[in-house]
């Protein structure tokens, strides 16, 4: 082997470490379709280039512990098919099914783990289900092994389930690597919960990545109930933060590429005993949302309406006070800074819960402002715009090619009237393409200019969000 050949494996590792893109894992809550018209998000209205992985939440497990299913209401709305349509715009988009969630609890998972036969059957049936509905992978979101009725032995058994998944996925015959299914696990990243629920070293070997829920560090469920931000970026105390937990997971020996940092697109609220409460003050319970979380698309309305936004210096995250309600959340600035943490430390990427909670309608400004902030923070804005503009041109080119085929067809059939009609349509499409290309050239110049400045600059922290 010559010197240059011996360098090849090393160079490949360098490329994978520093040149490959980041994961942008976006959970999509199926129930988002049933919100009021302004906040409802249909699958077809999702920008197909915002995410590398679009994760449907949630699939459930039947009473036998051997099969996955989704509520009939989702099947009736053909949500899977509508999500698949996004691939016509972006063929590289990965569609993933997340199974579990908080509402499902532990009982169904324990049924899966009841025997080795159950686990084998569940995994094989799951793979069939994924292939039937054209999913690219599965995300296991058990909340949480060894808790909520789950036995201590389930920690070890969950590892066994994951090992069976890995084995069955590896032996599945596929045309090429692009068809391989991916396997991820959504976890509570705190030291106590993750150590109690998971055999991290064994699981890590068998999954593609972790989706770390870097939120809900605090909330109305704590005793005593104190006002605290639920997703602090940094902290000078012993309180959990995104920065410290990310370090902990790397120190555990988890490869950086397998760590996706979770960002909440919702706020956590408290009803306070006194107005203008601050961090550490006692709270009476959850705020007006009843503890379910307030979508950022709602919070931006309040800020645009004049509610003053504040910033926590130690935690580097924002909050608002609305009467006796205190709400901690993430805004475009804090989201971008969390994404920059991922970029600077070469972690695997970002996970968001959930894309349907972003301002997808553009009521407060640009559409999907938090996702766009993530793209800027990861340094992927140029690639995103390149893909988006190319897809826009390709849609028109497809219509041009179709019109050309129809001209040929009608000419061969001797139908000059229809051939002329198609020629007119073809000319209109070509004119439209020229106009789009002219507009895109201006857009691209602005993109390049912004990239030369290091990305869209952040204003001062005193500048209200959704005003820049």
Curated annotation (Swiss-Prot):
GO terms for cellular component: extracellular region. InterPro entries: Chitinase_II/V-like_cat (IPR011583), Chitinase_insertion_sf (IPR029070), Glyco_hydro18_cat (IPR001223), Glyco_hydro_18_chit_AS (IPR001579), Glycoside_hydrolase_SF (IPR017853), Glycosyl_Hydrlase_18 (IPR050314). One of its GO terms (molecular function) is endochitinase activity. This is Putative chitinase 1. It is found in: Secreted. It comes from the Eukaryota. Residues 386-440 form a coiled coil. It comes from Margaritifera margaritifera. Disulfide bonds join 26-51. Chitin binds at residues 73-74, 100-103, 144, 213-216, 353. One of its GO terms (biological process) is carbohydrate metabolic process. SMART domains: Glyco_18 (SM00636).
